[in-house]
Amino acid sequence: MGYFKERLYQQYVILFIFYFMSMAALSSLITVYMRDIGKNGSEISFILILSNIIALIIQGLIGYSNEQWGTRKTVTIYVLISAVISMGLFFFTGNWLFGLVYGLANAITLGLAPLFDVLAANSPYRFGQIRLWGTIGYAAGQQISGIIYDFLSPKSIFILYLACYFASIVFLYTVPKPEQPIVSSEQPAEKKEEISGGHTIRNIF
C-alpha cells in the first residue's frame, strides 16, 4: 500500500471520511432524536416519508446542476445551501417544519453521494481504494454520533454534521477536478476493471 504515503491519496481519504461521517451524523440517530423531542411513531414516519419525497425532487435537481456547473461547484453550492437549511434543526420541532428542514438537508447530503463516486472514479487510484474510506467514515460517524449524543447533548450530532460537512468542502479543493483527472501510476486496464465491478476486494489493496 505504498500509495497510502502519497499526499494526494491522503487528501482523498480525508475528503471521503469527512463527507460520509457527516452523512452518518445527520441520519443515523435521527429517529432516536425525534423520540427524545417527543415525537410518536406516526409523527416520525410522517417526517421520514416527507424526507423521501423531498429526496426524489432534490436528486434530480442535483443531477441537472452537475451537468450545468460541474462536480466541484455543484457540491460546494449544495453543501452551503444544506448547511444553512440544517440550522433549522436546532430550533424547529413541529412536524412540518422539522420534516421540511431535515428532508431538505438529508436529501441534499445523500444526493451528493453519486458526485463523490465520480470523484473516486476519476481519481488516479482504483475506485475501491478511495470508496473504502467512505464506508469507514460512515461507520466512524455512527460511533462518534452515539458517543456525543449520550455524553454531550442530542443536538451535538448536528454540530458534528456541519463540522464534517464543511471540512469535506475544504478537502474537495485539494483534489483534481473530475473533468481533469491527473495521470495515474496505476494500470489503466486494472482501474477500468475495478470501476466495472471486477475483483473489488482484491483491488482495494
Could you tell me what each predicted segment is?
Residues 73-88:
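Structural signature of the two symmetry-related core transmembrane helices
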